[in-house]
Amino acid sequence: MGKTTTALNISSALAILGKSTLLIDTDPQAHSTISCVKNPSQHNNSLYELLISQDNRVDDYIITSTIPGLKVIISRISMAKLEPTLLGQIDGHYRLKDALSPIRKKYDFIIIDTPPTLGIITLNALVASDAILIPIQSSYLSLEGSDDLLETIDKIKKVANPNLRVLGILITLHDRRTNLGKDVVSKIKNVFGRKVFRTIISKSVKLEESPAYRESIFTYAPHSVGAIQYKQVAKEIIIRAKN
């Protein structure tokens, strides 16, 4: 349970809390898309077409999700072809930022779900963003890649997006019953300090099941611990975004 589960459920929580929210799925696996959009294959316009065509009519690519108040720009497998295409373009890192320019002030929050690798699609997301939320699973191995990500963020700030900041570190898949889980949380807090969100996402059967049923936690188990915790995280995000 990591970035896609977090992006989907935080977007859903923000919408449920009354914030106008847009979720952008940039991952070729399209897990966010299939979890909150009915019959996504019936929609012709995806993020791939938007970025390839450099169409400035971004509203034509925004569709309604199964979560009230949550809008989506969908992804599909064709996004995998975008990586080599953008690598050969002078403006390759800026396509997403340019595409979102007309609607940035239209939404309270625009959440971007990224691929699992630090390729040019993820770099597009970092260039287009004001802030980044980093989910870290409650295990020692999950800390290993954090240094590379933070180094990439620093490079992006210096070269392309000086306003980019780390909004927070979200601990997920936490087992409160084990000493190991407690030790990892302590380690993460020692490394990242006040950047760590107060709310910790517990390991949960419902949270692990919801992607298999192609749903967010709010449509699959709206009264579960996972839903309550993600809503608490969303409230923290609203506060931090104001600062």
Tell me what each language-model feature is.
Residues 1-243:
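P-loop NTP-binding core
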